[in-house]
């Protein structure tokens, strides 16, 4: 899941207009705000967010200094005949030499500016490019030219629709977008688009239940998140890293307890949980840790752990077969604990029977400290 960042451009108009953009961005989960140097501290008073500032020095103590406004980058000054004579590139180089995180800002007016942007991208941490007439071709060219550089390409857009196109240009897409819009809905939709595109779908398949056996008492982990989950959403949990069950959130009401859609009653303390491309032990999770929420179609999104409870409870062994593999999970023996059926419908472990089909995720290879490795391993 490659991170796609959203920057909010808030350097024009009065402070109240800029403030509205910034607060909407903060509330919606934007990654960075780009302002004028005099507004850096004002932004920090509003909330905790990365602040970039248009400048040629770092007197504002911004997290990122962006060079190019009122320079060659935006066309205020003419482009240099030779790169070593560039006003903007020299300023960026001096800042980089001082250990400052630097962005280069270039408005793509024609092919000459595209070449200039590529040169800026070779020395800066970030390359912010925008067009006078929004086109994909310059972005494609820059992604191709700079694919082996460390620079992150942030493409200027005015809507969520343009952002989606920028994120999906070529295979890699832009690393982020610089959104220039005062429309609160466009800000929210752009950030939503970024988060959706960060997540690759998990390939789920049906496994046939072969064994359901009550066990004795043991310690189980309950994961309470800072996120509300829908029916059919939960987490991938299992006793083997090579295959995990989709354990449903407590999103359904029952005769005994109200729904708790923020919770996944996840499994015994030894169990693995899949988080992104890695696995962790359930018992290792702490408040503030990221988790991966998965639905019955395999769509993934990031969640945040709010609290983890480990308590002694009666347990149940679930065994199922998918392809030629036998998978197991040990869950709490209670009606509110559910796996997700082949059709996306949650099935309580208390009603689970041999022959039922439930959704699982199979993995190839083994795991070493949670990372996938090419190795033969047998887990029973």
UniProtKB/Swiss-Prot annotation:
Transmembrane segments: none annotated. Gene3D superfamilies: Aldolase class I (3.20.20.70). GO terms for biological process: amino acid biosynthetic process; aromatic amino acid family biosynthetic process. InterPro entries: Aldolase_TIM, DHQ_synth. GO terms for molecular function: 3-dehydroquinate synthase activity; dehydroquinate synthase activity; NAD binding. PANTHER family: 3-DEHYDROQUINATE SYNTHASE, PTHR33563. This is 3-dehydroquinate synthase.
